[in-house]
Amino acid sequence: MLLRIARITTIAAFLATAFLAPASGADTDPALDAPLPLSPQVKVGKLANGLSYYIHQNRKPEHKLELRLVVKAGSILEDEDQLGLAHFTEHMAFNGSRHFRKHELISYLQSIGVKFGADLNAYTSFDETVYVLPLSAERSEDLDRAFLVLQDWAQGLTLNDADIDKERDIILEELRLGKGAGDRMQKVLMPKIYNGSRYARRLPIGQEETLRRFKPDALRRFYRDWYRPDLMAVVVVGDIAPAKAEQLIKRHFDGMQNPANERPRTYAAIPPRTDSEALVVTDKEAGSAGILIRYPVQAFQDRQTIGGYREQLVETLFSGMLNGRLQELSQLPSPPFMGASSALGRLTPRYRSWNVSASLGTSGPAAAIDAVVQENERARRFGFSATELERVKKTLMRTYERAWNERDKTDSSVYAAEYMRHFLEGESVPGIDAEYRYVSELVPGIGLDEINAYARRTIPDNSGKLVVYTGPAQAGTPLPTGEQLLAAVTAAERREVGAHAEKAVASALMDKPPAPGGIVAETRDERLGLTRLTLSNGVKVILKPTTFRNDQVLMSAARFGGQSLFDDKDMFSARYADTIVAAMGLKDFSPLDLRKVLAGKAAAVSAGLGNNTDIVAGTAGASDVETMLQMVWLKFAGVRRDEGLYQSYIGKQMELARNRQSQPGALFGDTMVATLYGNNPRAPRALRPEDIPRIDLDRAIDIYRQRFSSAKDLTFIFVGSFDPAAIKPLLATYLGSLPTPDIPTAYRDLGVRPVKGVVRREVNSGLEDKSTVALTFTGPAEVTEMEELRLSAMTEIMNIRIIDVLREKLGLIYGGGMEGSMTRVPYAHYTVGVTLPTGPENVDKVLKAAFAEIERMRTQGPDQADLDKVKTNWLQTYRKSLQENSYWLAVLQTSLTEGTDPGTILSFDREVRSIGVADVKRAAQRYLNTENYVQVVLNPEK
């Protein structure tokens, strides 16, 4: 299903995962027994050797193609001498094959604009391995070679001993990178979560001892056994004729054969839990505390009938209402948890279970357990109200309406993911036309009695369960015992609960619109397709109507000011003023009431203080622009002060700050900022527990009011699917009536500057044998569009070199790289950062290799081939971005805050083509100044 009912989260963030058991009486209705159709947009076929294929012609984006090779084989199929080799096989797909020598594949794909990691990628899970290859569809020779790549991945990997042994170092670095509190706690949890099944012993990353010592034949055996046509699918979605795609599939895959005496592809069973048990898992470096209650697993298979689809809608509505109640609890003045969810969730493709989880705040595990279990019991015993059901129906219907509106503007990658799920999980793919029709016909007929019966049938009562507490082991912090966790659940299940009390709320954001202003000036920019308006209160507007999407309008506005206008004593009140105000609601609406009023609306608005700017941003569906504008107006109309919600917000911030302190990265990050900026108090560091008392509610409200009681000097930009003639009266009403009293609209340069010279620091933090090298180069810059491009070209080419040398040649890292930026505000300067995770024993080698590549770039410049790879990728990305509302909005907004010419959006390709090797070399000499940088190295605790 295009929307995957159980995963819809974009508008209300209210859905649970998974599907549900048959609703009572559904099987007796002949119409509901009818099978779901297959979307007419996709051609599904199967070759004689068993290989499945999916073909969907789609022109969003134009001239692009999304290819997937999907293999129903993952770590669950590994033999005892193969732990981690499913994932290792995935790595070897990029290290030599029948038609591409080692490293030749990545180099070739980069040459046609495919970026390694960002575009070209793969993943290995328990039950599948998936290879992702997006590319330009403009040249037929590239298409044929792309299918040749898929062919080699499927059955053409060379897997020679030398290449396998060389890849061990990279895999071990990936293993090292994943180590930490989460990994240590997971190893304790997995046997319990999967109830002793094979899944607990088959984590895709594998085991270090096996990865170091396995024999290459073990890896070749895995590839031979499981990479076979009857376990594979090829997915082709994009700007290609279906007949051409099918021809390419048959040419490259028809000749493949399944192995003789093939091993059966079985699926591991997860035994149901019969007795309740509890587990307390702590770690010194854990970054948060939480509870999980997992009820017995249920075998599951998607029912691909209209009745099955209706049952999924019932579950979606039920999950939305139950989790809406949990969200309400999280926003109480003294919440029992920071956030919680309760739903049927997929554990594996063939199993699901009822899960209750909560992230803990200051109230502790007992209060969280009591609250979530009681809320489940309340729903099971008393069900829901008609108003709750009506709200969640509105939201669901609006979500499907927007998806249907965008049916010809849906990205190919979305369809590719849908067809992957069809192959791997049996998910239905009726197409959005059919889905929207079913939802429109079925949802109105789903009544409260049916929902409440589903709740009684679905929410477990006293079943055998696993209760888990996870969190940091901190001195002075009491921890629960397993017995206490079980006792808390039992007590909550037995406690008397009453029906949910539903409070009436207003039906609209505003009783009546404000007295409108007017439009006093209008100009047209034909070159960029812009209309510029000046309203009667001085507010300016830029309109860019597009046809890139059918149901999307984006908005932003910015002016100078922000946190820079406030003194050091107010810095934390200023930093958190916007989020504090948002946490208390909007004008007269509490956050809970606002969510209810906005049910069925696709609109959101935020107002915030950046370091040097005031920012207003919003998004809406085409029919909800007025709602978005009403929210903008209310943002300027006053602040809702709520001491209880403020204390709830501050409590959550304190918990987050405390938990952050236990993580090795916290000390590392703080040291980097302090070292780079010479301990300047206004440097952009993370919040610490000792900073919390410096936040004052009334001062934060006052700061917000100072900046958002006036719309002076704001220019609002609108990009998307709107009619300028229809939107102008709304702009005059809601933006033209905003107050514009005089306020400061210039930023203040606080004098935050990086240190000069070479400064080196070492940080010792963390239990694992892992290190991180960080280099930061800074300095003044002459900021122009061309100079920013030269800097970006340099960093992207350096990343190619870092992967080629530090990863592939030397095996010192798994990931990491370089990034750079320039800005004119508050002063013209550049920043280039390099981050390279590695092992303590390799720190000196990494530094030596990194500086060798820097020196090579400074003295020799880049290889022309590498520069061409970057430019080709940029030009392809640019052509795609030109068809995106978000890109136009970003360019127009940057032109206002940075003072640049928005017309450069039309000359980007010419500017890119003009960049030469000498330009990049000069950029390296200018921006990689080896006499002016900060080096901070994170090593383990001594």
Residue ranges and their predicted role:
Residues 1-10:
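Bacterial N-terminal signal peptides that target proteins for export
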Residues 24-55, 241-308, 312-313, 319, ...:
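Proteolytic maturation boundary segments
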Residues 9-19:
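Bacterial N-terminal signal peptides
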Residues 54-56, 61-88, 103-152, 183-209, ...:
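M16 family metallopeptidases and their MPP-like homologs
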Residues 227, 708-709:
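Flexible, low-complexity linker/tail segments at the boundary of structured domains
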